[in-house]
From Swiss-Prot:
Function: Low-capacity facilitative transporter for trehalose. Does not transport maltose, sucrose or lactose. Mediates the bidirectional transfer of trehalose. Responsible for the transport of trehalose synthesized in the fat body and the incorporation of trehalose into other tissues that require a carbon source, thereby regulating trehalose levels in the hemolymph.
Organism encoding this protein: Drosophila mojavensis (Fruit fly)
Cytoplasmic compartment spans: 1-398, 468-479, 525-530, 580-642, 701-706, 768-773, 829-863
Compositionally biased intervals (Polar residues): 47-59, 114-129, 177-187, 336-347
Membrane topology, as annotated: Multi-pass membrane protein
Lineage: Eukaryota, Metazoa, Ecdysozoa, Arthropoda, Hexapoda
Localisation per UniProt entry: Cell membrane
Glycosylation sites noted in the Swiss-Prot or TrEMBL record: 434
Keyword Heme: no
Extracellular-facing ranges: 420-446, 501-503, 552-558, 664-679, 728-746, 795-807
Family: Belongs to the major facilitator superfamily. Sugar transporter (TC 2.A.1.1) family. Trehalose transporter subfamily.
Protein's UniProt name: Facilitated trehalose transporter Tret1
């Protein structure tokens, strides 16, 4: 202390000597503070520290504006920030004196009174005599001028800042952070954005995320920052239909309720809702470029064209329930699904039909809207419940290549139908000794009719390995030439053995074709029309039956066989034009060929990658679960259910007595003593069979499989019991001449009922419900079982009539149909509108109960 005091005592007389080191130190302090401020992101506004006013400046080193400084930063001494800086040891080495602090001026500070720490420092310096303080002008009494000055500097572009610099000269050093002009401009522009700009920006953004989290984030942003109903009114239909401004305007401008509904349907079809804004943007661009003053027919065509644009396909977005970030996400999905189910876009067509009627949408555009708007459906993969935001394909459903494939294989079914009906008209002329060079006994005639089902049994067994190793298409193609040979053997026969050989070869081909045709169509046709196009083989089969009945009226058995030999020729030619099924290519590891087949079937502009990946996933699951022994796979518990359903449907189909009726139609009418010619009756039955199949083709994708099976069962039960009653009355000697029309009427209703349901649906469902890994072998077993039942019924029908009478045979068939009704009610699933993968997951028991998002039921909907 003594040394320090001595230095201070000498300072009074030698002020200039001590003033020079202090001035030099203050200059260094100024430079270091300036450098430190620049390093921290501040820039110097003004500094005028000189040797003449060091006393004035040292006690006022405070920032001019406190706000640019970070308020939450901890207060640190200059020594702590800059260890090399010792401003208070310039004149005295005072160890117990606190260093000079430097901190922002806070709002709670008293401007007129320096901080306590500075007062202590001043007192220490005064007592030492080393520093003489010069009073400053009084500081401002509040912080408002500083705030006003800061705002004015932003508005006037720096003019106020220059004036502030001039006013600060000679007083203090201050630092401030550069203003972020870009953020202010962004905020101002954000405030000026209109709702339309936000919506267009949302739709036009190129980097739209396919990840559901990104999509939900975008949607939440729109819903949080804009009026929801405004957004929905401009983009799509609101949940509250009458509350939507757009629809309110439509309602006001419409002259009638019918016009309002029409306008609303067009609006929904064109501006359809999509989680991918790119789809909506594409449609907007097309709409803006199209003419608005076209006639009604042109508008309708434009509406359909927009909906069916192949390039507007979007890939599914998989949403795992556990990934939903909040309840609002789930509420959004729930509300969206409620809206969509009310707007008649359910995957269940029966439900859709009821909703169409409720909403007065009818059948004109109902299907188009249902296929244009996305929906949320339940899927399950690897046991984990998921939701799939799925938009059904906007490809044109009836693509000509797909129809060509269905027609090509259906021509094979026409050959099958002709072969099945051949015995009914042919046996009449074959047993006539005047028209045949060889004798055909009744026993041989029964074998002519019964050997074909027996050969079909062998063909069904052999067809399973064929379609697995040769492929579906190649197996079908391989039956064409043997069909021709079989008919030539019959036509050129000189004895019964040649006829039986020809019938056996034809039956073998029939068994293979019956197995492979539904499998091919089930694997190539889209789910939306699989029912309609899947019934084409049955329809063409009935055409073959009708053709055989009509031609048999005018031709003998030999000429009829020559006609049958010409039918496989167009079938053979068309089969060369169509590809193998993509599913079979995938099972053989030929991915590129599968992609080409899908492009051929779905159209060149279609996006086939999602479907191809689904096929590959399904095949991978099948490969993981497959064993070396395919027949042992059939006995697995998970496979027994679909196999037993298929076998049950085949059993009730044949035990309904249909083939007995078809094979022996003429003889039945002769035994009934009908006043109508037997050949005419067969033609009538064939026409009804043909017409009923086309009715089923129209209804099957609207009413569903099970509804048609119910109708079919009831119709067959009633007619078989009535027909049995007629034959019972005839056998007891009662006069039935007044009701000679009854057998034909019963046969017509019976054929109508059979062709609506139990005729085509068992074959269709065989290609739908059997799992992919056992489809070939299981279809082989089901087909063989079907032909076994056919053989038993046709071969034993005459014996049944001899034992229990015609009435007993028909009553037995009716009782079996009655049991079959309960089998359908309790055991057969509905497969309408479902993909093969969905059906397989359900049949294998992989689908678990979902949350309310997936299981929600449609609410009541009122306009």
């Amino acid at each position: 202390m003594s040394g320090r005091d001595n230095r201070g005592a000498g300072g009074g007389g030698g002020g200039g000597h001590h003033h020079q080191p202090l001035s030099s130190a203050m200059g260094k302090l100024k430079e270091k503070l300036t450098r430190a401020g620049e390093e921290l992101g501040y820039h110097r506004v003004e500094s005028n520290l000189s040797a003449s006013n060091t006393g004035t400046s040292l006690d006022t080193i405070l920032p001019e504006d406190p706000f640019p400084f970070p308020q939450a930063a901890p207060q640190r001494h200059p020594q702590q920030q800059f260890p090399h800086l010792h401003p208070l040891r310039l004149l005295h080495d005072v160890d117990d004196e606190p260093p000079l602090s430097f901190r922002p001026l806070l709002e709670d500070d008293d401007i007129n009174e320096p901080p306590q720490q500075i007062q202590q420092q001043r007192s220490a310096l005064r007592s030492s005599g080393s520093l003489e303080l010069t009073p400053l002008p009084p500081p401002p009494t509040s912080l408002e001028p500083h705030r006003d000055r800061q705002q004015r500097s932003i508005v006037t572009g720096g003019e106020e800042l220059q004036r502030s610099k001039q006013s600060l000269k000679g007083s203090r050093v201050s630092f401030e952070k550069p203003q972020q002009q870009g953020n202010n401009k962004a905020a101002e522009s954000s405030d000026e954005d209109s709702f339309e700009d936000k919506r267009i920006g949302f739709q036009q953004q190129k980097a739209t995320s396919v990840d559901h989290k990104g999509i939900l984030k975008d949607l939440r942003h729109i819903l949080a920052n804009d009026n929801r109903r405004q957004f929905q009114a401009k983009k799509h239909v609101s949940l509250d239909i009458k509350g939507t401004r757009f629809l309110q305007d439509l309602l006001k401008d419409s002259s009638s309720e019918e016009e309002f509904h029409k306008t609303r349907r067009e609006f929904q079809g064109r501006k359809h809702q999509s989680l991918d804004p790119r789809v909506t943007f594409k449609l907007d661009k097309v709409l803006q470029g199209s003419s608005t003053d076209s006639d009604e027919e042109g508008d309708d065509a434009e509406h359909k064209r927009l909906i069916h644009r192949p390039k507007d396909i979007t890939k599914p977005v998989i949403i795992d329930l556990k990934d939903l970030e909040s309840e609002s996400d789930e509420d959004f999905l729930t509300s969206r699904q409620n809206f969509q189910q009310q707007r008649s876009i359910s995957t269940d067509s029966r439900k859709s039909r009821r909703l169409y009627e409720m909403d007065e949408m009818g059948n004109k555009r109902g299907d188009n809207i249902r296929h244009a708007v996305p929906f949320v459906r339940q899927i399950t993969e690897d046991g984990k419940p998921k939701l799939e935001v799925y938009r059904p394909t906007t490809n044109p459903i009836y693509i000509w290549t797909q129809v060509l494939a269905a027609l090509s294989v259906s021509l094979g079914s026409l050959v099958v139908g002709f072969a099945s009906a051949y015995t009914s008209p042919a046996l009449v002329s074959m047993t006539n000794t005047n028209l045949t060079s060889f004798v055909v006994t009744p026993q041989a005639a029964s074998w002519v009719g019964g050997i074909m089902p027996l050969a079909g049994l062998a063909g069904g067994i052999a067809g399973g390995p064929f379609i697995e190793y040769l492929g579906r298409r190649n197996t079908i193609l391989a039956t064409a030439v043997p069909f021709i040979i079989s008919w030539l053997l019959i036509a050129c026969a000189v004895n019964v053995v040649m006829v039986l050989c020809g019938r056996f070869l034809a039956g073998f081909c029939v068994g293979i074709a019956s197995l492979s045709l539904p499998v091919y169509l089930g694997e190539t046709v889209q789910p939306e029309v699989r029912g309609t196009l899947g019934l084409l083989p049955t329809a063409f089969g009935n055409i073959g039956i009708l053709l055989c009945f009509v031609a048999g009226t005018y031709m003998d058995w030999s000429m009829l066989a020559f006609l049958g030999g010409t039918l496989p020729v167009p079938f053979l030619i068309l089969m060369f034009l169509i590809p193998e099924t993509p599913r079979w290519y995938v099972s053989r590891g030929r991915e590129e060929r599968a992609r080409k087949a899908l492009v051929w079937l779905r159209g060149k502009e279609a996006d086939v990658e999602p479907e191809l990946k689904g096929l590959m996933r399904s095949q991978a699951d099948a490969d993981r679960q497959a064993t070396q022994n395919t027949m042992l796979e059939l006995l697995k518990r998970s496979n027994l259910k679909p196999l037993s359903i298929s076998l049950g449907l085949m059993f009730f189909q044949q035990l309904s007595g249909i083939n007995a009726v078809i094979f022996y139609t003429v003889q039945i009418f002769q035994d009934a003593g009908s006043t109508i010619d037997g050949n005419v009756c067969t033609i009538i039955v064939g026409v009804v069979n043909f017409m009923a199949t086309f009715i089923a083709t129209v209804l099957i994708d609207r009413a569903g499989r099970k509804i048609l099976l119910y109708v079919s069962n009831v119709a067959m039960i009633l007619t078989l019991f009535v027909l049995g009653g007629f034959f019972y009355c005839k056998s007891t000697g009662m006069d039935t001449s007044n009701v000679g029309w009854l057998p034909l009427s019963c046969f017509v209703v019976y054929i109508l009922g059979f062709s609506l349901g139990f005729g085509p649906i068992p074959w269709l469902m065989m290609g739908e419900i059997l799992p992919a890994k056992i489809r070939g072998s299981a279809a082989s077993v089901a087909t063989a079982f079907n032909w076994s039942c056919t053989f038993v019924v046709t071969k034993s029908f005459q014996d049944m009539i001899d034992v229990m009478g015609a009435h007993g045979a028909f009553w037995m068939f009716g009782a079996i149909c009655f049991v079959g009704l309960f089998f359908v009610i309790f055991y057969v699933p509905e497969t309408q509108g479902k993909t093969l993968e969905d059906i397989e997951r359900k049949m294998m028991g992989r689908v678990r109960r979902m949350s309310s998002v997936a299981n929600i039921k449609p609410l009541s909907f009122n306009m």
